[in-house]
Amino acid sequence: MQSLADLEAALQTPDKPFDQWQPQNCGQVPITIDAQGRWFYGGSEIKREAMVKLFASVLCKEADSYFLKTPVEKMAITVIDVPFIIVDWRFEETEQGLALCCVDNLQRAWLVSAKQPLLLREFEGVSVPYLQLAHGLAARVSRNVYYQWAEIACSDEQGYYIESLAKCYYLA
């Protein structure tokens, strides 16, 4: 059994110092992320996962706009809903209890915790869980994962929920 700190360290990707970078806004680049988390350049899907992961590593949200941000430039892109989709999950046993780990469409693992909570938002007229990430980003829980969670969810007077690190996250 591992400690929560060890699990967080294992899952953590190197964080960019976006707060320290103050580049000029250099305009818009024709990159769009559709509602399924697919990345497009000029209308053509970017199929190389390494390229998408590179772009994702410099992606941030400021106010209501998404940007690819580096120390020297900041380019706006279009995001239809959110840039990432939760496509898989697992529980990890820690000294602090079971931790819910979510895997996004880029095969990156994220720990559901107070720092990265599941929040309910509207998507296509339905209340859906989203995982809140750093730098204003979020990942929508896929329908498949949602139904898997529904099968194991607990309930109380507020509704159905799933637990991570002894905290309840409501599914609807």
PLM region spans:
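Long, non-globular segments of proteins
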Residues: 1-172
